[in-house]
Amino acid sequence: MDKVAKRYIERYQKAKAFREQWVPLFEECYEYALPQRESFYYEEHGQRRDDKIFDETAVVGVQEFASRLQSGIVPNYARWADLISGSEIPPEQREAIDNELDEVTEYVFEVLQNSNFSQEIHESFMDLAVGTGILCVEEGDSLNPVNFSAIPLPHVVLDTGPDDRIDHVFRERKKVKFDHLPLMFPKGTFDNKVTSQMGANRETTVLEIVCRDYSTKNEEAYLHYAICM
C-alpha cells in the first residue's frame, strides 16, 4: 500500500475510534429526533426506527429548527449574499468593480436556485440540530454546474489539527463499484490493482479525505484524496 494512503488510513482509524465513544449518544439523539436519517449501526433497508417515539416534540422541533435556519440564513429564491470590493481596492475603482461583481453574484444565485442546494442544505441543518452538518459541494456539468449533497453524519469522521480546528474530514463510502470510480473521480489516477477489478462488477470501499494543506503558506488550501480500502 502507498505510504501516503497508509498514513491517512491510520489517522482515520484513530479518529474513528475516538468518535466511537460518542456513537451511543448520537444514536439515541437520532432515534428520538431524526428517526428518518441513517443510523450509526447497521440496519436493513426499510427497518423502522420510530418505535421509541411517543411524542412528536423532538421530531417537529428539529424540522422547525432547520426551517428557521434556512429562512434566516439562506432563504429560498433570495439573494442572501453579495460580492463587493474589499478595502484594498482604491476608492475610485470600487464602483466599476462592484458593478462587475454584481453580475457575478447574480449568476452565482441563478446557479444556486436551479440546483438542489435548498433541499440539501435543509437536511444538513437537521443534522446540525443534534451534531454536525456536512454539505458536500461537487463540480457538475453544463446542465448542473454544481451538485450539493448532505452527507449523513454516520458516514463522516472528523479530526482536528494543531489549532484545534477541524482540518480533516473522512468519508467512508461502501459498496462502490470499481467501474464507477473513473466517473466519480475523473481526475484520479488508478493503479493496476484497481484497474484489474474494473469490468468484473466488483465492489470496494472508498475512503475520501478532505484535509488542510499546511505546506501552502498564507493561504487556506485543501487536498482531496480517495483511497480504495
Indicate where each model-derived feature is located.
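Catalytic nucleotidyl-transfer cores of nucleotide-processing enzymes
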Residues: 224-229
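Extended, helix-rich architectural segments
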Residues: 1-205, 211-221
